[in-house]
Amino acid sequence: GLVGEILFNRLDTMQAEIRATRHPMFDADKLLEQVRQFSELSAAVTKEIEVRRDGEWGQRLLKDRVQVGGVMDGFMDRAHKEVSIALPMQRGAGKSADFSKPVDAEKRDMAMRYVRLVVGSRNFAAAGSFGAKQKDASEELCFYLRRYNEDVVKEMRNGENRAIAETQFHFAIALTALLFSEEEAELMRRRGKAAQAAA
């Protein structure tokens, strides 16, 4: 009926807006809101109208969800790369954090946008058909950041590149607050102060 057609037109429009989003020019908050709305509306349509998967609307809805999921899978896949550019590790077997040269603010901003996407989509990733990728990205980022945090505190205590380490430390705290918790970020701040005092 007419209501169904209106709802599906709205879903198509939302899906098209999400598909038009590209790296590197994207607003994380806007994209999160678009995907959240799409996920909620598509879930509501499925539940309320009891869309049959094999029907015309069921196929349309499935197609829209697959396309939105594909876009978000791409962003989730790229998150680790962007964070590793902003929090670089040395090449080689040991792979400890690299403080040999400063990281520019644009790279940190890009990494922050990706982390906000990963964290911000946690509650609706499954409904948006990218739950597995979101979970993988989140776990990968958490593991990477824990390793980096250990190295940055060590560098602040007795490293040769303390000024670079301090800039990276503040950025790592911001990521820690997002990926873990504000409490974990506060613990990190205290460890940093202790490292500076011991330097």
Question: Where are each of the predicted segments found?
Answer:
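Extended alpha-helical scaffold segments
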Residues: 1-156, 163
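Short amphipathic alpha-helical coiled-coil/interface segments
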Residues: 35-38, 169, 192
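Beta-rich interaction/scaffold domains
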Residues: 58, 62, 178-199
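Extended alpha-helical scaffolding segments
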Residues: 141-190
